Design a protein with these regions (language model features):
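A short beta-strand-loop structural module common to alpha/beta enzyme folds
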Residues: 47-56
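Exported/periplasmic ABC-transporter solute-binding proteins
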Residues: 18-43, 56-237
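Sec-dependent N-terminal signal peptides
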Residues: 4-13
Length: 237
């Protein structure tokens, strides 16, 4: 009897784990999504497993796991060939900024070319939304050839934020969400004029499994509530 109960508990646990909604989120949006998921669980709607990373990491995980939803830049989701999205729900607009370390004098985007700015961190363009936006900006503003020797390319936005916060680099190209999250640790930030990069539309992209998943559909509705919109606005979306 005891053996049977153990097997029954294991079966139930396995069933619960299998039914847990799994989502993937661009690393630059971890902070607001963590807050959203906390609110979702506190209201008794269930637990959601979320993984965070750059786009390459997300696509790799989504192919191996039953990911139902991906929260990221719509352009990245549309151009990749590995996953088939059936719907996109708007969450907000991403804003690219230049964050600078404490003690660094930085008043305009042109200051990137100053001799006083020795190092510029940014995420990798092929793997991260704001790396792509950063490269667009540097090329469109005709800065790239003048600053390419200063560039330090890393995998994710959080890495760039960390380097700026600890003054391992003078400035970094990140999103407004990350800059606001680190505002006490950095010197400040300047928004990159929208004219220099393609608009960034942050969406919840639904995969096929989401269509018939009640938990997934409920979460999508939850994302549209006024309380959740307030969270996204607070984090610069």
């Amino acid at each position: 009897m005891k053996h049977f109960l153990v097997l029954l508990c294991m079966a139930l646990l396995s069933h619960l784990c299998a039914d847990t909604l799994k989502i993937a989120v661009g690393a630059g949006y971890k902070k607001p999504i963590v807050e959203v998921l906390k609110a979702y669980e506190e209201r008794g709607y269930g637990k959601i497993d979320a993984m965070y990373g750059n786009m390459a990491q997300i696509f790799a995980h989504a192919k191996q796991m039953e990911i139902a939803l991906v929260i990221a830049d719509k352009k990245f989701l549309e151009k990749q060939k590995e996953l088939n999205f059936v719907n996109y729900q708007n969450i907000g607009t991403g804003i690219a900024v230049i964050a600078y370390a404490k003690g660094v004098s930085f008043d305009s985007i042109e200051d990137l070319t100053n001799e006083g700015i020795k190092s510029i961190a940014m995420p990798e363009a092929k793997k991260a939304i704001y790396g792509d936006a950063g490269m667009e900006f540097l090329n469109n503003a005709k800065f790239y050839d003048r600053v390419k020797e200063k560039l330090l390319v890393v995998a994710t936005v959080p890495q760039v934020s960390s380097y700026v916060s600890t003054h391992e680099v003078d400035v970094g190209i990140i999103n407004l969400t990350a800059a606001l999250d680190s505002i006490d640790k950095i010197g400040g930030y300047i928004k990159i004029p929208q004219a220099y990069y393609t608009p960034i539309e942050i969406v919840a992209g639904s995969l096929k499994v989401c269509e018939n998943d009640k938990a997934c559909q409920n979460f999508l509705m939850f994302l549209q509530t006024p309380q959740m919109r307030e969270i996204f606005v607070k984090y610069g979306l």
